[in-house]
């Protein structure tokens, strides 16, 4: 004898269940997972190019150089174009190398130095530090994500409308939308992880 066929309503229930299993959304990529991903390498180094679009100028101001990061330890920032300047950011503050090769505390806290300190938090995935000053909105997944920072402190609201960071395994691009109508686009290239640092970077970071 042929086996009994299931009732139509049972068939519909099974079909609905199978469809729901195939269309379940993937778990959202969280800021904690992003932080862990960016903090995983022992070191990150590479090049950077920056374009600064100023309302008062027809063409962007372009700068570039090299950087080396030890997450949780320090950042060496070597601006090479259009002039040479070396900065480092560590827990004890921001320093600039003088003509004699000595590191001097950057007491003036220039805009460039403050920006480099922000990049240290961004590149190193220090979301706890970022959350002190910004509301974070993350989209995408571990392979391709975008993090939007909206200022929440009075100081940051005076400077930025928002900051948009994008990347994959590492940070690849940072866009700064500033209050005065200016805009900065920073791109990171030739990125390497867990490779020996240059002598200049080792000296700057005290290794």
Please report, for each region that a protein language model flagged, where it lies by residue.
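Well-ordered beta-strand positions in beta-sheet-rich domains
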Residues: 62-66, 86-88, 104-106, 162, ...
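Gly/Pro-enriched, hydrophobic low-complexity segments
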Residues: 127, 131-135, 139-207
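Sec-dependent N-terminal signal peptides
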Residues: 13-22
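Short, Lys/Arg-enriched N-terminal segments with co-localized hydrophobic residues
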Residues: 1-9
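N-terminal leader/targeting segments and the immediate start of mature chains
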Residues: 20, 27-49, 53-60, 203-207
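Short hydrophobic/aromatic-rich beta-strand segments that constitute the beta-sheet cores
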Residues: 48, 69, 75-79, 94-97, ...
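Structural recognition of beta-strand segments within beta-rich domains
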Residues: 55-61, 66-71, 75-81, 86-89, ...
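Acidic/charged, solvent-exposed loop-and-adjacent secondary-structure segments enriched in E/D, K/R, S/T
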Residues: 98-121
